Amino acid sequence: MSYELPKLPYAYDALEPHMSKETLQYHHDKHHKAYVDKFNKLIQGTKFEESPVGYVVKHAEKGPLFNNAAQAINHSFFWHSLGPDCGGEPEGPLLDAIKKANGSFEDFKKDFSEKAAGLFGSGWVWLVKNPDGGLDIVQTANGDTPFSGESRPLICCDVWEHAYYIDYRNDRAKYVEAFWKLANWEFAEDNFTAGADAEQRSTTHPMQRKGQHPHRPHSSH
């Protein structure tokens, strides 16, 4: 049984003017779909054929199967990291944890932005919660993912060129500025306070097999 491309949690034009309808159509319908389709082909006949995609990224060797599984998960998580009428700052325990780790929310934004704009080549930048409860800003190159480790992703920014080239050409820094106007802190707060069991973690990358009843997604606004 193969996996389906998850639907966007909002309309294609919902993130304008910061992210265009054309970008979402290409990014979701072409790039994300290609990773899901390739993953479905590569998993056939392997020992992971009946495994959840989250299990695959934790246990598969680095290579084509891992890369496409990770990229499928990363993109699913990224769509929920954004939302219309979002931006601003988080609240409550997450904001307190960010201030504890970075000194202030503005210092956190500066550090995250520098890591996103400065990442060499393609990849992702994540805010993660470590097993000890502390927060880190993590860069992952190409198709790598923190879902393969023990830290829990809270929110992420895709810095592959296909995420921003239609709207911002080669100006990645300007794209990162726009990211902050779309950042879905309610989603990040839910991830920060959620339990660590497999069922709760699976809701953060809602890829479902065809015919499977989907989990209720996190709010995107």
Give short role names for the model-derived ranges:
Residues 1-221:
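Feature for soluble, non-membrane regions of globular proteins
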